[in-house]
Amino acid sequence: MTNGYIGSYTKKNGKGIYRFELNENQSRIDLLEIGFELEASTYLVRNNEVLYGINKEGEQCGVASLKIDDNGELHLLNKCLSSKAGTGCYVSISEDKRYLFEAVYGAGIIRMYELNTHTGEIIRLIQELAHDFPTGTHERQDHPHAHYINQTPDGKYVAVTDLGADRIVTYKFDDNGFEFYKESLFKDSDGTRHIEFHDNGKFAYVVHELSNTVSVAEYNDGKFEELERHLTIPENFDGDTKLAAVRLSHDQQFLYVSNRGHDSIAIFKVLDNGQHLELVTITESGGQFPRDFNIASSDDLLVCAHEQGDSVVTVFERSKETGKITLCDNTRVASEGVCVIF
């Protein structure tokens, strides 16, 4: 049995963090329940037996740490709600487990926290830094919108996507916080959202929410150079849709991207050691607004959370040979689910 967690909005019926048990032998979710009620816990990241989630209480915003016990159940360690500037949308951990990074979409800021490497507790907010970059012309690009922050494969920097400014910004970081290093620009109105790095560290897959495209970019010393790009929806689709999540299979052979509105998952074959992509197929996600999904470590199953409609959580069997996914007859509900991790 594999334990997984789903983060959610808490605007309507969402409860914060859901816990589920994935039965990989039977290709189904045997249990899905409230793991821990945590307001606005829309993104999660795991460090072994500690789970970190976005959190807010009233006007105070920040992050929370939770202990995962032997049964997969969650117990609060502590919270660090040191800002009133807005609720985050993405969190990640540095390779040395000393820092927690947070991106705040609405306010266009990034935050950096110090962690206790022994207990996993959050010690303090080190810095809160606002983006101040020229923005694109799309109506949603009224100001900078930091959407993703994570350490680069070389370990030297953090890369931050800015949906409002159509770019990736890299920063050096240490105990004093962030220091601007480089920026990489994409097309106007792309709405640069998330990055998935190939294991070789040379290539990155950059997804753009507003243009519904994925770029293959060469990564070198904090800089991203676009090599090619692909649509993630059919060319003839003219409905309202926006790209969401991106994940590589663990064997690095296939890339998956979800589309909210078209309600699908696009599957690409990874070619030439990560340098090129080739569209395999686009598959219905089985629900409305597939905000996030993840692939089990076995590479056999994919679990997708849907933010809207009935907020179903769908399970797909996955072919390691073709990359294609097949919807299983097993759905659960995680209200307002927007993040899936194992």
Curated annotation (Swiss-Prot):
One of its GO terms (cellular component) is cytosol. One of its GO terms (molecular function) is 6-phosphogluconolactonase activity. It comes from the Bacteria. This is Uncharacterized protein SA1737. It comes from Staphylococcus aureus (strain N315). It holds the Pfam family Lactonase. Belongs to the cycloisomerase 2 family.
